[in-house]
Regions:
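Conserved alpha/beta-domain cores
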Residues: 1-146
Length: 146
């Protein structure tokens, strides 16, 4: 059997189907809640996808927001991604010492769980003249492991 060497030969039908299903569910939820259609942000977690799949999602299917959950994975494929019109969000646990590696690559960080991490993000973002949106994790249930 001949090995596939280009994205032209590779089928991404599963991505078309999955995205259509997710968008339909989002539209139904918007309708049920009374929100205007298209006002909900679709953030595609791409942790197990390869760069061809991600580029297909963003450049062919129009997904504009992708979420990475590992610093090393983000760094290893960052240059191969077609980032035209795409915002990358960091959605995984982030150690303070790794902020410097992603601060110029992400639109937001969704996992800020300590003041020291927030301060490091602020310091690194200011150094390059950027503002980074952050989402703060709050342990409202006083659970010890959160």
């Amino acid at each position: 059997m001949e090995e596939l060497h280009s994205s032209e030969q590779r089928s991404f039908a599963y991505l078309d189907e999955n995205l259509a299903r997710v968008r339909a569910e989002m539209h139904a939820a918007e309708e049920q809640s009374g929100r205007p259609r298209g006002q909900t942000l679709l953030l595609a977690a791409v942790k197990s996808a390869d760069t061809e799949e991600i580029n297909y999602l963003t450049q062919t299917l129009g997904v504009r927001d992708i979420g990475e959950n590992r610093v090393q994975q983000l760094l290893s494929r960052y240059d191969a991604l077609d980032k035209t019109g795409v915002r990358i969000h960091f959605i995984g646990s982030l150690q303070k010492n790794k902020v410097k590696y992603i601060i110029d690559k992400v639109a937001s960080i969704h996992s800020v769980d300590t003041l020291s991490l927030a301060e490091e993000i602020d310091k690194r973002a200011r150094a390059i003249g950027r503002r980074i949106d952050v989402f703060v994790e709050i342990n409202s249930g006083r659970e010890e492991n959160k």
